[in-house]
């Protein structure tokens, strides 16, 4: 290469270096501007995300294509030109808004009915909120797992077996039902006289399964305002589905499940509406889901036939008055932690407690302990139990005379 060519080549390289330096300087300025913009937007987001939020419900999600919208001579909003999902929300102030830009939450994670927090000025969705349940329904969830066991229940072996087949087996061994191709029962109705162990067996069943236990009392579902009781039933089943596997125990079902009749009273109609919502929920969830219903009542004769039909409360378990052998077993169970003399004859005690239910047999053991405590003894004798039987019988007769 000649000297002139080298000089020319050097000049070209110098000009290329200058161009590249100016390009680097321009890109550096752009990068700094972008950083400033990101910082500014982050500050705006931080300001927008300050609490409190306006609570809203997602009504509908829409797919909007800006190419479908033709506006002649009108100013075009950049936000409306973004292709993707849009949302229709309803705020707690009962106003409905259409959002072309959803906000900071991924649109794919939203679904109609979700509870969201929006900015009170721009209405952009800032955060998804947990599902709202009635505080009374949350209070129905039993936080502490029941400690009762099947060995604490005497004289109900057949009833225990039927309840295990209907509730425990579908939860713990679902594959056995799938292999046979049968559908497990949706629910169980336990009926019988008071004090025969219905609630006790339900608590023992909840203790044997690792399920969430929701305890509803029938009178709790009878509310003053129209639709309030039905909302409690809906929220209870929604909470049970969210926390599945779960067991819903409805005690004193006859408070809301009595036979329907024509009535002019608003209170009677409200009770019937609550029962219709219960029927709807029993039909609504699939039998394969891990939500089971146990209902208990001592007035099965006044229940509505719609509740008793197959497909709702499929398994019906009767709790009769305990026989002589069952009464002896119940008193043995309640006396096993007491300091009892070896001469106590439980068979003879069972023969003396004719027409006693399980709760009264337990009361005999408690009364015997109090009698022994009264005379300063260190152990319970057979005579203490006999006196306890007399005490419980006297209370029983007094109650009968009082109610008569």
Swiss-Prot record:
Its main location: cytoplasm. The keyword Nucleus applies. The lineage of its organism: Eukaryota, Metazoa, Chordata, Craniata, Vertebrata. Keywords: ATP-binding, Cytoplasm, Nucleotide-binding, Nucleus, Proteasome. It is found in: Cytoplasm; Nucleus. Belongs to the AAA ATPase family. Pfam families: AAA, AAA_lid_3, Prot_ATP_ID_OB_C. ATP binds at residues 192-199. GO terms for cellular component: cytoplasm; nucleus; proteasome accessory complex; proteasome regulatory particle, base subcomplex. Gene3D superfamilies: 1.10.8.60, Nucleic acid-binding proteins, P-loop containing nucleotide triphosphate hydrolases. It comes from the Eukaryota. This is 26S proteasome regulatory subunit 6A-B. The 26S proteasome is involved in the ATP-dependent degradation of ubiquitinated proteins. The regulatory (or ATPase) complex confers ATP dependency and substrate specificity to the 26S complex. GO terms for biological process: proteasome-mediated ubiquitin-dependent protein catabolic process. SMART domains: AAA.
């Amino acid at each position: 290469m000649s000297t002139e060519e080298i000089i020319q080549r050097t000049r070209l390289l110098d000009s290329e270096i200058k161009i590249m330096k100016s390009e680097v300087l321009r890109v550096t300025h752009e990068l700094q501007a972008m950083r400033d913009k990101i910082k500014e937007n982050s500050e705006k987001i931080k300001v927008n995300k300050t609490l409190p939020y306006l609570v809203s419900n997602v009504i509908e999600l829409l797919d909007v294509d800006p190419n479908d919208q033709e506006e002649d001579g009108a100013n075009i909003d950049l936000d409306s030109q973004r292709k993707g999902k849009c949302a229709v929300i309803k705020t707690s102030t009962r106003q409905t808004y259409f959002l072309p830009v959803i906000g900071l939450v991924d649109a794919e994670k939203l679904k109609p009915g979700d509870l969201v927090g929006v900015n009170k000025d721009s209405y952009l969705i800032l955060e998804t909120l947990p599902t709202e349940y009635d505080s009374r329904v949350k209070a129905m969830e039993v936080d502490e797992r029941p400690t009762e066991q099947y060995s604490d229940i005497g004289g109900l072996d057949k009833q225990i077996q039927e309840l295990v087949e209907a509730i425990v087996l579908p939860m713990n061994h679902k594959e056995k039902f799938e292999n046979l191709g049968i559908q497990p029962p949706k629910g169980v109705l336990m009926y019988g006289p008071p004090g025969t162990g219905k609630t006790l067996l339900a608590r023992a069943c909840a203790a044997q399964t690792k399920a969430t236990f929701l305890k509803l009392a029938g009178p709790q579902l009878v509310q003053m305002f129209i639709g309030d009781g039905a909302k409690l039933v809906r929220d209870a089943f929604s909470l049970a589905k969210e926390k599945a596997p779960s067991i819903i125990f409805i005690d004193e079902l006859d408070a809301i499940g009595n036979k329907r009749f024509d009535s002019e009273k608003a209170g009677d109609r409200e009770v019937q509406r609550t029962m219709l919502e219960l029927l709807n929920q029993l039909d609504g969830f699939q039998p394969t889901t891990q939500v089971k219903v146990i209902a208990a009542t001592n007035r099965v004769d006044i229940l509505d036939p719609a509740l008793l039909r197959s497909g709702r409360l499929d398994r019906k378990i009767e709790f009769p008055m305990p026989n002589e052998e069952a009464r002896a077993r119940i008193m043995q169970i309640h006396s096993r932690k007491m300091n009892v003399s070896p001469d106590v004859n439980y068979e003879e005690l069972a023969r003396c407690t004719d027409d006693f239910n399980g709760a009264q047999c337990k009361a005999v053991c408690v009364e015997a302990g109090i009698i022994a405590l009264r005379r300063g003894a260190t152990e319970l004798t057979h005579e203490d139990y006999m006196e306890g039987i007399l005490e419980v019988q006297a209370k029983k007769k007094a109650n009968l005379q009082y109610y008569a």
